Amino acid sequence: MKILRAAGRRVRAFVHERDARSRYLEDLGAEVVEGDLQDFDAVSAAMVGVTAAYFCYPIAPGGLLQATALFAQAASEAGVHAVVNMSQISARREAASNAARQHWIAERLLDRTALITTHLRPTFFLEWTNWAWVRRDTEGILRLPFADGRHAPIGGRDQAKVIAAILQNPDSHDRQIYPLFGAEELDYNGIADKVQHALGLPVRYEPIDIPVFAASLTARGATPFLVQHLSHVAHDYRDGIFAGMNNLVEVISGSKPMTVEEYVISTRSKFDTNGRYAVEDVLLATA
């Protein structure tokens, strides 16, 4: 949003509800429209006058495919030229995760339209480092079920730069599927070392079993749909689905992707407390 507004682009944001986040968008100069992606009339009204759209649906049960169909039809009727679709690196026909398979089908639905269409398949985000972070007085712990798998974590800001670049010049990206990676491929021991260097605090990676991870997610209030997705994604990660490197972020956006250290330094206060889905000691004791 910031990038598009700085470039002088008119931006309309379709939000589920008005809150502090939508007010922030308004402060940036965006036109904010409240609605539901399952409401065809609301989506259709929001598409009027739009030339390019970014489509992103949360990991939630039962809604992605219908929302994609409604979005595609509304965009086609309104004469939208291009769409950038947020998918995921685990999206494929044979995916065991319900969400990942639905993302693959959603890609195919959009490909059947006349819209200029680009699919983004990012690996895990740098923000995951906060998500599962366990903070103690004298150390930090990353407890995750990813064994010795590897990935090149990408920052949300870097993906935003890619999205903004494609939205402004979409034609050369038509029918492309872009796996997006960050600055450096690492295993979680390597990520822990980078976080330790940035914080000046001992940090270690503690691998856990997938059922323990799933139980912790459930205890933290995650939906069964999200638990199913992340449990199978953990298997995918171990199998190398999230691994790899390319330079697409720099080629498309013109900027090198953020490193782990740069991310940690820029979000240092978030490492002072446990992350939203931190696996607590008490759960490990009962596993």
PLM-predicted stretches and their roles:
Residues P211-A287:
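A hydrophobic C-terminal alpha-helical subdomain
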